[in-house]
Amino acid sequence: MKKLFSRLNTNDRQAIVLVGVNGFFWFAWAFGCYQAVYLQGAGFSASSMGVVNALSSVVGIASVSFWGMASDRMGSLRKVLITVLIGGSLMYALIPLVPVEFRGSPVLLMCYIPAVCFFRSSMSPYAENLLVRNCNELRLNFGVLRSLGSFLFTIGSLIIAAWLPNLGVRNTFWVTGLFMLIPIIMTFFAREPAARVPAKKGEKRSMNLGELFKNKAYMAFLGFGFIFYIAVACEGNFLPYYMASIGVDSKQYGIILALRATMEIPFLLFMIRLRRRFPLRVLILGSSLLMGIECIGLGLLANSLPTMMLFCMFFGLGNGLFIGSSLNYVYELAPSHLKASAQAFFTSMSSVAGILGNLAGGAVFDAIGAKTFYLTVSALFVLSAGVFLLSFKGKRENAEVPGQN
């Protein structure tokens, strides 16, 4: 093994390390996607679930902004990622220890789960940030490396779906933390993306965030993202309740997640070719429309697990497009010294949208029913696409794309 690694150049070794970080992060994440199912089993209604998720989004806003600015000030994305991975994994593993049988249990969970999100909400954004920045700087193929993350998420989802009847939902929390040790260890060996030299002790450094918010393209993307993430929050967080409404066991949720992750792979693999032919904004636009098609299918035609799987394929395709294009879009728009902050504020904006999506979504779901709810969500996806399309007017995007992504 040592001889094999000695023959690899620095970029090849870092590509393997990045797969260990990002790929196995998503493998571990697949085991931790059953929080909604756990709370559903604990007696939480869709409205109560919406409140929990909204509170989590509030904390998420502070989380990604805090860790983003900490990363830029320290000049180290890697240290921040290690911190949030360790903190988020430990606190998430302890969720089943919060009692659910007492009268005050829902309040305890509504306090503890958002607290977990101070770390957990920043785990995936900064794992992705480490990957996209190193891919750009080392001229690695982001689409291929990220597709391995989707592939490993698929494998993890299938494993937990088969294991869940024997394992039990409450044990998925600590299993997630156990598998998260792999990306934590691999992050120690990851390359630190280029950054400013951290400020000396006692030295104050201006972040110049006004430079970021004067960027019209970035602000237009934030506007699109606000509507888009309201729809995403509504679509994803209430899917177990939708499954129950059409007679599908919500414990089959892992199969849906595995299929979606599999469908992300084609667009990620061909992202270089797509970027050579289409501007990033067009790819982002296509992603929201594909997700809207899924919601139309759920609202009009799905009535079983197989038909759900058919339409969820569209969401997977759309998510593959969005993953491959959105991170690089933010990376290209942001100044070199504000890239982590740009990603952090975009993620914070998604959390703000998540608050509205979860609070309103839970109440609307209970009021109008699952089918009509998902038709409404499809309209939000189409609306976000329309708003983003309007921002194209009078602007020309440079279509010349570096070959590394």
Where are these regions (language model features)?
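Cytoplasmic membrane-interface "Motif A"-like loop-to-helix N-cap segments
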Residues: 72-85, 276-288
